[in-house]
Amino acid sequence: MKIPLLGLLLLISLVGSPTRAEEGPVCPKTETLSRASFPEGFMFGTATAAFQVEGAVNEGCRGPSLWDIYTKKFPHRVKNHNADEAVDFYHRYKEDIQLMKKLNTDGFRLSISWPRIFPHGRMEKGISKEGVQFYHDLIDELLKNDITPLVTVFHWDTPADLEDEYGGFLSERIVPDFVEYANFTFHEYGDKVKNWITFNEPWVFSRSGYDVGKKAPGRCSPYVKEFGKLCQDGRSGFEPYVVSHNLLVGHAEAVDAFRKCEKCKGGKIGIAHSPAWFEPEDVEGGQATVNRVLDFVIGWHLDPTTFGDYPQSMKDAVGSRLPRFTKAQKAKLKDSTDFVGINYYTSFFAKADQKVDSRNPTWATDALVEFEPKTVDGSIKIGSQPNTAKMAVYAKGLRKLMKYIKDRYNSPEIIITENGYGEDLGDKDTDLSVALNDHNRKYYLQRHLLALNEAICEDKVNVTSYFLWSLMDNFEWQDGYTARFGVYYIDFKNNLTRMEKESAKWLSEFLKPGLKPSKSSKLHEEL
């Protein structure tokens, strides 16, 4: 049964157990969903990334990144936009931290820009003192306002000099350079920051950048649908596996350095993965298809950091195109995360692909799967999707994904490192009566927070934090500024003015500290 977003009367009635089960989180008993419904100490925050918000690309000796070069070289692939100014977080972070306070959040996920610290990619070629100080000032301001930082070391902004020298993550030479940079950040900020992420979305970084050519550096083979004609270089079905392999080896070495860092004692480190959930389209053999695509989407990077090697299904399918880890690398990779970061947005139907051309390999042909937000004949859509939405809304997928990770990966600590609703308002983008009344985003957050609460309180999944994407509208990669994900609206034509959306008002109420729900009331929202 499909439930329309608009005109929906949403009734959220939540009954949690006040007593501890044999294992798992303890949830207070509440009648309505609020901050009070989550376990004691549960953190709520917002998330951003350096390239998407900072701007100031030519200040403080910052060097160019992969994405700076890409947006200038291929403007038609990013809506003719760039992030030279972005939302000017570099100069306005104090103002934006007050927006976080207004939301009643107590966490903030940020990323450090590698070329803002090492303009040319390596320490020996120079350190930007201003860049280093910027992150000190930002972290200090967060802590002064009782907001806990979660810091991502790499969020796709490879220094351009390393791209030019040896192809960035296409070369194993990236490993020592990344580890040097990561180790520098650990020792520089480790006494203030206790929560770290080495890499953001390795699946997206490798597949979108090096297999389908959708994101920087925009590499793919000519036979790839949609972007094949745009890609000037690349080798789909080969390069994404090389990139991820180097990334995983770099992660293991960086974690080894982190665990030896005296300043970092008591800290935690992980990777932010970006799996969707998948429902089987065909009943016969459907679950096998789902299991296979999950191996290729999340197991690709989570299996090595948990068990020390790639999923067997990937090794069988990809064969010699999938690099092999040495025994020493496997030993370092195994149990190399303290938590599993999850960026969840949407879900798909998965269907076995029987029409694979092995002469033109890609990640998708190796996975032997097709996935879409609707069935092949279009008769059934997964969840619901308003006309302006970037992705289908399917909160059940979040709960199912949490349970899957708990069961397959030995019940790890999980942090929701991103979750949010994106929309393209088209010609209504500057119509504030539309843009600020983002009821669909409010609905999305309500449904997903309810699903997350059920995963924690009923399924006993060990989720400890939730970070909303995003604090504010920003540069959304290939979509430029046309896709809005923020709970604060950015007026890109009027001094980057920040404006509160309806979702921000709702979230602020939801997160009010000490809020106790009325015993006789339930939450009704006219959407």
UniProtKB/Swiss-Prot annotation:
GO BP field: carbohydrate metabolic process
Catalytic activity: Hydrolysis of terminal, non-reducing beta-D-glucosyl residues with release of beta-D-glucose
Residues that bind a beta-D-glucoside: 52, 155, 200-201, 345, 418, 469, 476-477, 485
InterPro entries registered for this protein in UniProt: Glyco_hydro_1, Glyco_hydro_1_N_CS, Glycoside_hydrolase_SF
Superkingdom, natural source: Eukaryota
GO MF entries: beta-glucosidase activity
UniProt-listed Enzyme Commission number(s): 3.2.1.21
Pfam families cross-referenced by the UniProt entry: Glyco_hydro_1
Active site: 201 (proton donor), 418 (nucleophile)
SUPFAM superfamilies assigned: (Trans)glycosidases (SSF51445)
GO-annotated cellular components: cytosol; endoplasmic reticulum lumen
Keyword Endoplasmic reticulum: yes
Keyword Glycoprotein recorded: yes
Keyword terms, alphabetized: Disulfide bond, Endoplasmic reticulum, Glycoprotein, Glycosidase, Hydrolase, Signal
First-tier enzyme category under EC: hydrolase
Protein location: Endoplasmic reticulum lumen
Motif Prevents secretion from ER: positions: 524-527
Residues the record marks as carrying a glycan: 183, 462, 495
UniProt signal peptide: 1-21
Disulphide bond pairs: 220-231
Family: Belongs to the glycosyl hydrolase 1 family.
Name of this protein: Beta-glucosidase 19
Organism annotation: Arabidopsis thaliana
This protein's encoding gene: BGLU19
